[in-house]
Structure formats: structure tokens, C-alpha cells
Amino acid sequence: MLRLKNDRFIRALLRQPVDRTPVWIMRQAGRYLPEYRQLREKVPNFMAFCKTPELACEATLQPLRRFPLDAAIIFSDILTIPDAMGVDLHIAPTVGPVIRNPVRSAQDVNRLQMPAVEEALSYLFDAIRLTVKALDHRVPLIGFAGSPWTLACYMTEGQSSKTFLTARAMLYQQPDVFHTLLQKLTTLTIAYLNAQIKAGADVVMLFDTWGGLLTPSLYRQFSLDYLSQIAAEVVRQKNGRKIPLIFFTKNGGQWLESIANSGCDAVGLDWTTDIGQARRRVGDRVALQGNLDPAILLSNPESISTAAVDILKSYGQGSGHVFNLGHGIDPSTPIENVAALVEAVQNFSIKNEEPINSYYR
């Protein structure tokens, strides 16, 4: 098995020495890139794009041609699992995801399909295999899924929302039904991530975008317990190498210790948490990823560089930090500002501790 030419991202996730802080960007493949917008015109809708392996592979590679990033993330969408379960999913250009048959009763949950993941979502695994070949071991490839709670939010609400009131009300009105839905999603997510690893993903990540909407008790019951189940059952070793697992709960800083104890290797932070304080809270249990406010990328290179250095200083010396945004990059972000961010992180964080490819010896 050939080793990666640049493995500092994996080394940082495992809290091993690195020569500098690795950097990648959530939604680094996407609408802020003119070449992506041109590529997107080849198909009539977003899900058709995701389901075309050659296009998904090309979109994954595009940001690496512009910026010296330390990881690639496969181009896909978190709603691929609900789509495979038979919900009537439509991605509206100005609205976002719309599910025309929302799941709001025991009967609705029972009607959901439990497909063979490797067949129903084969397009994603084909895209991963194409991307792994194209990357030629240059950087690690991240696979991902949405958390069961976040997927259930869209499936029950029927569309995106700032509050997901329908989903949250169901937790109180029909808790058993909601748990049944979450368990189905968890079972499929485990199979989905394992199939991504089998196809060639080096790291996997779970996006719990809406976990921060919950009370502490409900977060544990309806989100974190299922994340912990996934952590326990996802493949964590392949060909003698560890497959790191990242959990990201937006607005989850108040539960940082609990997330760190859930079985993941790294915790993603949004911009509302001080990363230096977060490091002191978790100690050496997990690595941390984040956590620049995406809004600052709409300012200017000087402000971006200052803010990036502030985060690096707050984290302090040593490994265990992956630089990223605190959420996905905004589509209106100027490309030159992304370049300024990557350059600032790389220039400030050089540590010269060990050769970067020693993990794969």
C-alpha cells in the first residue's frame, strides 16, 4: 500500500507531530469557484451532479488546483441517504432541499426503504474510487455523512429551516417514532461510511449541523447517542492504518467534553467557541478542527490573515489542530481571500518537527 505524499492532516487528527498546521475548508469544492459553476451547467439539477461520478470527482479536485490544501473532501451532499430511502427530494435553486413527502408518523417511518447501501449509493463510491486514482496519493480524501439527527430534521420538517420547529416538536410528541427513524438512519450511515472507507476514503466526518438547536438532554438522547453508536461501528483500521473520525456539531461548544468522549478522533468547532479554551477543556482526548468565522472571508486579505493567526496563537504550539472554517464557505467569497487564508495559515504555523510522510512508514 503506497503512503500518502502529504499526510499532515491525518497526523494532526491523530495528534502526532506535524511540520505545520494542516488546512482545508468546509465546502472547498463549490459555488465560489467559477470553474465549478461552469461544470455545474452540464447537468439539469444538483442531485444529478452528485450522482455523476466523473463530475463529482472533478469538483473534488478543483480547489486543489487553486490552493495548496492538505486534504480533499469528496463532492456530495448529506441528503444522499434520505434520497436512497425513498423520500421525494428536490433541491430548489433558491430554497435548498425540499422533501415533498415529509416523515411525520410511525406509518411514514415504516414506509422508508432500507436499501443495500453499496448498490443504492454506488455513484458516490465510484466517485471516491475515481478521485483516489486522480489524487495519486497526493493528499488524503475525506468521506462524510450527515448526522442522523440532522438528516431527520430535513426529513420531518420537509425543508430547510432556522429552527426546525416541526422536528423538535416531534421529539416531545412522538419520541419513540423519532428514535425509530434515527436508528434507521444510524444503521444506514454506518454502512455508508464503511463503504466510503472501502472505496478509498482516508478520513470520515459526520456533520451534525443542527445539533445545536437541542436542549442538553435532548442533544444527548437524540444526537450524541447515535453519533457514539456510529463511532463504535465504523471501520477505524484499514491495511494497518487508522481511519480518523471527525464529529462536527454546529453550536455544540457547550457539549465539547461530551463530544470528545463519544469515540471520535477529532471535534470540529464553529466560530463561537474559543479554540484555546476548547483545547484546555478536552486535553489530549481529541484533536480540534476549526474555527474561523466564514464571514471574515468577505472582508480583505489583511483582516483574514490577522484572524487566522489569532486562532493559531490561541490554539498554541504542538499538533492536534486542523485549521478550517467554523462552517462552510459562503458562495460569494472572493477567491483571492481564500488564497490569503491558506497562505497565512501555512506561513505562520511552520513547526519543522518531523518529515510529513512518516505516518505511512
Swiss-Prot record:
Gene: hemE
SUPFAM superfamilies membership: UROD/MetE-like
Keywords, comma-separated and alphabetical: Cytoplasm, Decarboxylase, Lyase, Porphyrin biosynthesis
The keyword Lyase is annotated on this UniProt entry: yes
Residues binding substrate: 27-31, 77, 154, 209, 327
CDD domains linked to this entry: URO-D
Pathway(s) served: Porphyrin-containing compound metabolism; protoporphyrin-IX biosynthesis; coproporphyrinogen-III from 5-aminolevulinate: step 4/4
Name of the featured protein: Uroporphyrinogen decarboxylase
One Pfam family linked to the record: URO-D
Source superkingdom: Bacteria
Keyword set includes DNA repair: no
Catalysed reaction, written as an equation: uroporphyrinogen III + 4 H(+) = coproporphyrinogen III + 4 CO2
GO function terms (MF aspect): uroporphyrinogen decarboxylase activity
GO biological process, one term: protoporphyrinogen IX biosynthetic process from glutamate
Similarity remark: Belongs to the uroporphyrinogen decarboxylase family.
Main localization category: cytoplasm
UniProt xrefs under Gene3D superfamilies: 3.20.20.210
InterPro entries, alphabetized: UROD/MetE-like_sf, Uroporphyrinogen_deCO2ase_HemE, Uroporphyrinogen_deCOase
Location(s), subcellular: Cytoplasm
Function, in words: Catalyzes the decarboxylation of four acetate groups of uroporphyrinogen-III to yield coproporphyrinogen-III.
PANTHER family, per database record: METHYLTETRAHYDROFOLATE:HOMOCYSTEINE METHYLTRANSFERASE RELATED (PTHR21091), UROPORPHYRINOGEN DECARBOXYLASE (PTHR21091:SF169)
This protein's GO CC annotations: cytosol
Site residues (Transition state stabilizer), renumbered to this chain: 77
